[in-house]
């Protein structure tokens, strides 16, 4: 996980913010409770990962959660947490400490880091687990997990099964390397497939007592550090290739400009590769002697991570949208977050049942992704607020296909949805009559039914805030067009359960008199739809609407003229 790399403070200061960084308006007691709960969750994640090799949460959600904890501690003057690497520390000292890496927040931070530097190299940031490899007389004899950077655990028991790792050098020399053990993949495109839990899989395998040969063969090695190697990066890479580590040279590119680094970052992000990566590493070709390395991020190496696939967002409110048919859709309004350059402020929860199952309340921290790279999707709750705020959800039984034909209390949303559907492209196709217009008219008390807008005049429209004389004239023109719209557009706009391509015959009176059996003689109308049609035409509110439309002279709603006997 990313917390194998940095101490919490450095981590927080160098990770890009996915959520707004303003301090919450909390009491000290609430801040302490929220921070304590978040710390407990992070500690549990750390212990599972470091001791069992089990990742309970996606790496980037861990990153953002750790960042949020430090942010809260800074906001409220709380004591900083102990190093998240405490549980990773093992009994074996590394010959040379693992340094870790600073994370650069954005392109501007990368530009600042590169300013004035020469001899910069870029590499993919392999998404695996770091280790020290010790060769004696050309033979790999010891494998030590990164641990806390100073001491790690002994993974040497797995060496015989690591068939894809160079275990015998072409020369009988002593060698100490640092690198990334990663999951070998086939044609993996990071931008499409994400991390594929590659890091967690490798960590889980290495935490086992024993690997099978097949399991061991799924683990590869990328060497990124040769503490006592040649001074120049190009020389180190060339010699590593000769020693049996060609990937180090193949995936290391010298760059002169920010644009060069950005181009390679984009290339590796979208190209098929045999490994997962979560960004790129920028490193200087020259570095201090290994004797000066420390278990913290140095000046000569930095990471520029890929965009988040999931963002951690705080729920501000949950509101319930009632549609024309009575379907209730909970909408989570969140503290703005950014995914793939898209600013997200709200996300649909799909259904009332899903909201109830997730039990999302204001203050909860949720994971948000982009479905199809465009539509925000709430994946799950990551952290629950300590204080569970009550929410008043609409009663499911109150709203259905034949409810809310007037804006009575609790019916405003569905009523406005009905008007919007009526005037929209599915119905009358009236210009300038979106939900905002209908809401203003309803709030002003000018529209209290599905038809009284037909009687409005310019004087009353201009009394509504936000409606000018020009807007009033345009609305009246739209309303006037409604009078000449065909009967089938009115019928569909009012919500009659008929298909878009169904050929209608007869007027309102004839249709209202049909039985379910008679409706079933019409092509493409089955038992269920026929019952819905009978229920629609029999509804008292719908009959009242038809009567008012007949009085307004709308085609199809007036009864046929009586036949005169000769």
Swiss-Prot record:
Active site: 125 (n6-amp-lysine intermediate)
Gene Ontology molecular function, alphabetical: DNA ligase (NAD+) activity
EC number: 6.5.1.2
KW DNA damage (keyword) present: yes
Enzyme's top EC category: ligase
Coiled-coil zones: none
Domain of life: Bacteria
Pfam families, sorted: DNA_ligase_aden (PF01653), DNA_ligase_OB (PF03120)
SMART domains: LIGANc
UniProt-listed GO biological process terms: DNA repair; DNA replication
Catalytic activity of the protein: NAD(+) + (deoxyribonucleotide)n-3'-hydroxyl + 5'-phospho-(deoxyribonucleotide)m = (deoxyribonucleotide)n+m + AMP + beta-nicotinamide D-nucleotide
Homology family: Belongs to the NAD-dependent DNA ligase family. LigB subfamily.
PANTHER family noted in UniProt: DNA LIGASE, DNA LIGASE B
Protein name listed in UniProt: DNA ligase B
Organism: Pseudomonas putida (strain GB-1)
Gene (name only): ligB
